[in-house]
Curated annotation (Swiss-Prot):
Annotated residues for binding of [2Fe-2S] cluster: C40, C45, C48, C78
Protein's name according to its UniProt entry: Ferredoxin
Coiled-coil positions: none
Keywords (A to Z) from UniProt: 2Fe-2S, Chloroplast, Electron transport, Iron, Iron-sulfur, Metal-binding, Plastid, Transport
All copies of domain 2Fe-2S ferredoxin-type, residue ranges: 4-94
């Protein structure tokens, strides 16, 4: 099991957390005291949307984002595992629409 550095940045958040490759980014952030937006926790809405600014994630459990949005770097943090050190811009729901 690998652990990656995930930098979270946006709306008063600017922290780097350690996130194992088998833990969702939202869950790891909460465990480390970071309050990020969420609603369904199942990858079926856009409340937790972020944008990958660097690095990569596996969000194959999500069912909301279309291929174009994923191609633009959007990520649902509630169902995203890091696959490298990465930077996520948080609070990006409005950017989806």
């Amino acid at each position: 099991m690998a652990t990656y550095k995930v930098k979270l940045s946006g709306e008063g958040v600017d922290k780097t957390i350690d996130c194992p490759d088998d833990q969702y980014i939202l869950d790891a952030a909460e465990e480390q005291g970071i309050d990020l937006p969420y609603s369904c926790r199942a990858g079926a809405c856009s409340t937790c949307a972020g944008k990958v600014a660097a690095g990569s994630v596996d969000q194959s459990d999500q069912s909301f984002l279309d291929d174009s949005q994923i191609g633009d770097g959007f990520v649902l943090t509630c169902v995203a595992y890091p696959t490298s050190d990465c930077t996520i811009l948080t609070h990006q729901e409005e950017g989806l629409y």
